[in-house]
């Protein structure tokens, strides 16, 4: 009988040991909230002042480049909250540019050229955002990973008007 009691004690001790190790798992990590996605008032005024489609798209791409350059500088100095603010402004500019191009006729060659210009720039921006993503602490990583995915979708969205149902441009052939 004492052997049986010793087995119970050993079992209880073993069960107690495993019970204590279960709560030692990592808790939830605190993630940074996503930044506000907006276009600054002065950026919007500069964009609205451009009447030409090509010059407006080029200006929007320059502003996006400035936001990313400032974000890269803030990232290297360890100011991650400032980086997030710049990434939010960057994404706001991307959305604003797509909204502007979407209001124009997608069959117009000038509009298609600007979509192509936007897609080429988004490709280079995406690689820069991926470099920022590699250097970030875990707290900020989720939003930047989502931004990379968003840029992939945006590139596809910029390419879609280039490929329509017809292969050859021009009028439909007569019967």
List each language-model region with its residue ranges.
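Bacterial N-terminal signal peptides
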Residues: 9-21
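N-terminal start-of-domain structural block
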Residues: 2, 22-23
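Long, charged/polar, soluble alpha-helical segments
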Residues: 24-175
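Bacterial N-terminal signal peptides that target proteins for export
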Residues: 1-10
